[in-house]
Amino acid sequence: MDEIILTSQERLKIFKALCEHKNLTFNQLVKETNVQSNKLAYQLHFMTRKNFLVHAKGTYALTADAQQRIPYFSQILKKEVGVLPVILGIVRFKDKILLLQRKKMPYKGYWGLFGGKQINGESIPETIEREVFEECGLRARFERYNAIVHERLTLDNHPKHSFLFVITTLAVDSADAREQTEGKVAWFDFIETLDGSVSKVIPSDVYFLKTYTNSSAHIDHVVMSEHADDSLTLNG
């Protein structure tokens, strides 16, 4: 099939129609999107080849893999920048706290708490335990949730990044932390970290430590099941 160029708006219309309907025939897609049939056929063929679509019994439907990516595709196609959820971990051993010096923006070169993005299918404790191990080699154990905080980073008073932090506490049995690939790691005196004696610590992380180290928060974890007949059940 010869390459046919679709505009971003045409691709968005096709994707939007497939998100809003579980199954659509080709003619229904033509009606829903108002995209020329040759362009539509090309895009559907491309999406099927990339395993984004399944074509069966004369209808097209998003694959389960594609449905997992709906929130991300929507932001890209609409050119939206969303809030990024990040799991943070407070790792202490005796009177020390373990910090990571960031190698990447934002906050490149600053020391801060361990953390990262959640992989689909992980629980929050699984995420932060994995992140700590990947970043310093320690097998940390999740202990509790401390807080949920929304942080916005601005540049010249204009929004640059927006984060939703889930702050947690983890326990470790040793101080044998080693640098991996994410940046340098080091133990610092906890009190000196709070009073500003340690240079280049992310200011909001210092605030989190001062405010939430001894706090506890409740976060519910629920699992929903979607069935072939479109019914939903809440698992216990």
Locate the predicted segments by residue.
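Short, Lys/Arg-enriched N-terminal segment that forms or immediately precedes the first helix
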Residues: 1-4, 86
